[in-house]
Amino acid sequence: MQAPSLTVTAPASPSPDERKQEYRDAMARLGAAVNIVTTDGPGGLAGFAATAVCSVTDSPPTLLVCLNRTSSAYPAVNANRVLCVNTLERGHEDLSRLFGGKTPVHERFEGASWSSLETGAPVLDDALISLDCRVKAISDGGTHDILICDVVAIRENDGGQALIYFDRRYHAI
């Protein structure tokens, strides 16, 4: 008696464009804190909204920040080598949209109150937390640069609910 034959058909591999969209849809389901990353110095004033920010280590305090090379903030961050990660809280949705779009740089900063800590990068006065950093190293990450940043000063505000971005919408937790 002969064993029955089984025909296995592998699913068609997605095209590069389909894979890219599939990946973007998956990343939309990965909730993340909403941050405004700012810089100022010889390269100019700039800022952008980011969710691709995470802790690397606490010894010494180090952050990872991903920055798209096509971002209008890229030349300034690259030249200044300082930045501040300002973690947003409930009520900052409009500010996030300003920094996430094509709004001219000075109009972005007019929407809030700012100060500075050690590096001179703008610190959002009512951010949940602000992490003032010096860029220590930069690695290639496809369309983005991966910035490894030494945290040199921290400002925390009490209370507030963190603003996260999940499923292409803002949520407070």
Swiss-Prot record:
Reactions catalysed, as given in the entry: FMNH2 + NAD(+) = FMN + NADH + 2 H(+)
A Pfam entry, by short name: Flavin_Reduct
GO BP, sorted A to Z: nitrogen utilization; uracil catabolic process
EC number, as in UniProt: 1.5.1.42
Enzyme class: oxidoreductase
Molecular-function GO terms, alphabetical: FMN binding; FMN reductase (NADH) activity; FMN reductase [NAD(P)H] activity; riboflavin reductase (NADPH) activity
Keyword entries, A-Z: Flavoprotein, FMN, NAD, Oxidoreductase
Family, per entry: Belongs to the non-flavoprotein flavin reductase family. RutF subfamily.
Known role: Catalyzes the reduction of FMN to FMNH2 which is used to reduce pyrimidine by RutA via the Rut pathway.
Protein name per the record: FMN reductase (NADH) RutF 2
Organism expressing this protein natively: Rhizobium rhizogenes (strain K84 / ATCC BAA-868)
Origin organism lineage: Bacteria, Pseudomonadati, Pseudomonadota, Alphaproteobacteria, Hyphomicrobiales
